[in-house]
Amino acid sequence: MIPLIGQLYRNNNVVTSIHGRGLINRSVIAIMKAHRFARHRMADDAELSVHETFPILKAMSELKLGAASVDLGKMVAKFKAEGNGRSIEDFVKAELAEVAGKQNGDAREGTDVVLYGFGRIGRLLARILIEKTGGGDGLRLRAIVVRKGAENDLVKRASLLRRDSVHGPFDGTITIDEENNTLTANGNLIQVIYSNDPASIDYTQYGIKNALLVDNTGKWRDAEGLGQHLKCPGIDRVVLTAPGKGALKNIVHGINHTDIGADDKIISAASCTTNAIVPVLKAVNDQYGIVNGHVETVHSYTNDQNLIDNFHKGSRRGRSAPLNMVITKTGAATAAAKALPVLKGKLTGNAIRVPTPNVSMAILNLNLEKATTREEINEYLRQMAMHSDLQKQIDFVSSQEVVSTDFVGSRHAGVVDAEATICNDNRVVLYVWYDNEFGYSCQVVRVMEDMAGVNPPAFPR
């Protein structure tokens, strides 16, 4: 399977997955685990076999496909339900007719990407973008902008990309060219630009044009501040990886990404917590109606806090992060209404920072218009994770043994913990895990792909 998966990706820009679990650059063991995971997504809890997915993959390889995203697990399920005696080859050809024979038929230049800032989110975005390079007609990481911190700054930046205490080693190779201030990661040449002024850089001198710039610094959060980037030659659009202020659109992919217009030059990808809770809130509101509720986030500490007690402009934030639980504020409840206006005025929110470096939890305490049961709402959310437009945002787990570190590297915006669900008629309490670093970064990339118009069609329909 691995050679076919790789060939389809490199030659056809076809991304394969099994019920949302990506197969690109995965080991044999990881692919087998993805097949076994599928039992949580099958109606009869049956395990998915490579003997079922491989024939579909082989048939795909013979169709000269154009760019597409194909879920092999769902293809198997649809073939079982709607095959009607057809051969695998005929079924796959009919299902993928829209892109069959279109290899290189929609040749695009791709979209240049500049990361302005290279902290926790910036480095994870870099990893994801490098991983998704494919044939080069999607998002292409071209440059990173930072302030120079030391004489050996480039070496240190490369080391931080190569090694991560939470997310593990970089999957590939990184070489350094100090003379030209470039990094080469898995064959991708990345220019490192040193600057303290966002409006002073001419990106075109590095061959960058019509680029999408991602501001990871959080220093500017309104249109005026972020508009400085648009004054630079080579920059066409800007995405902020923090809640936006003023009239900026706060986009949560899967919820309101269709609001992104061709004229939108600056948008916000909201916060990690907003991305985690809004998809689940929308699912619940659509089915049961939300009267009101409270959102409590149990959030890992961040770089904004102190290792030991020291001054901080925020209340309690100056106290030692590794030693304390810290009650603080969150704007997620208010921000949720920006992405989902039907929730305006219905939610309150608060946060507790805890001594863990990554993975957080949102506790949604909701009063519903329609009464339900624990079993019913869990099954509904399970179905939403499997067969809805929110399947990339909502994941679902039903185990009494999972803990926070089990969700490091989750690519979903949030994961509903079914075993923790509490329900009493019209009142429900839902527990949603989320990787506040990597899961959020995946959401940011989805917003970037929509803004750049490089999202391939997804199959099966």
From Swiss-Prot:
Coiled-coil annotation: which residues? Answer: none
Name the top EC class. Answer: oxidoreductase
| Entries under Pfam families matching the protein | Gp_dh_C, Gp_dh_N
Sites of Phosphothreonine modification = 421
Q: Which GO terms describe its biological process?
A: glucose metabolic process
Return one GO MF term: oxidoreductase activity, acting on the aldehyde or oxo group of donors, NAD or NADP as acceptor
Which superkingdom, per the lineage?
Answer: Bacteria
EC number(s) on file = 1.2.1.-
Q: Which keywords annotate this record?
A: NAD, Oxidoreductase, Phosphoprotein
| Family label | Belongs to the glyceraldehyde-3-phosphate dehydrogenase family.
Protein name according to UniProt: Glyceraldehyde-3-phosphate dehydrogenase-like protein
| Source organism | Pseudomonas aeruginosa (strain UCBPP-PA14)
